[in-house]
Regions:
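Aromatic-rich carbohydrate-recognition surfaces in CAZymes
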Residues: 201-207
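Acidic/polar, glycine-enriched structural segments that form the non-catalytic walls/loops
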Residues: 1-200
Length: 207
């Protein structure tokens, strides 16, 4: 995630707060039901992590994030304030600005799942991947992302001539399908509502 703020007529301190929030509820169904159990949250000098477990299926996922912070395109290493709460973890980073100054935060996120790592290794794996993403850099990651999607479109695109609305609709659905599942792992499947819906708790079943 890359986020920039430019001061128009403000002089003072601007703070950006990259965090994880584990206190998320299901918006569409049973809004009082919590999705995650938080196993552990914390920060290192440069990373924050949130280790979670699903309430229904006992799957564990650890999210890790790190960041880079710029003022007028020059990286600044302002002393961050650590945020360490039971269900929220991250940093607050700030710098003094005057009109015309721009501050930019790039947030690098990695996710490690118990499908692919031993549970005791999830924090280390996610933190390591987040740091690797930061080292790779935003521009390279964006280019790799575009290339990966271009390969998907080259293989799956459907052209509908003379009907822009239908063309947009089919491409939107192809995008949602591949956001949900690409076929790489036979243990996974497509949830009933895809990636954009919360119905059925994400369960997959056959009718």
């Amino acid at each position: 995630i890359k986020y920039s703020v430019t001061s128009v007529n403000y002089t003072g301190k601007i703070s950006l707060v990259p965090t994880f929030d584990g206190d998320i509820v299901n918006q569409a169904e049973h809004p009082d039901e919590k999705i995650w159990n938080i196993l552990r949250s914390g920060t290192t000098s440069d990373c924050a992590y949130l280790w979670t477990q699903t309430r229904r299926e006992d799957a564990q996922i650890c999210y890790a994030m790190t960041y880079r912070f710029f003022k007028n395109n020059k990286e600044t290493f302002a002393n961050p304030i650590r945020i360490e709460k039971e269900k929220q973890t991250g940093f607050s980073v700030g710098v003094e600005v005057k009109p015309g100054d721009t501050v930019t935060l790039i947030k690098y996120i990695a996710i490690a799942s118990s499908l692919y790592y031993e549970r005791q290794d999830l924090i280390e794996a996610s933190v390591s991947e987040a740091r690797k993403a930061r080292s790779t850099g935003w521009d390279v990651l964006v280019q790799e992302h575009r290339q990966a999607w271009q390969e998907i479109w080259d293989e799956t695109d459907v052209i509908i001539e003379g009907d822009p609305e239908a063309q947009q609709g089919i491409r939107y659905n192809i995008f949602q399908l591949y956001q949900t599942y690409r076929g790489d792992d036979p243990r996974l499947n497509i949830g009933p509502k895809g990636f954009t819906g919360e119905k059925y708790g994400g369960n997959t079943y056959w009718n």
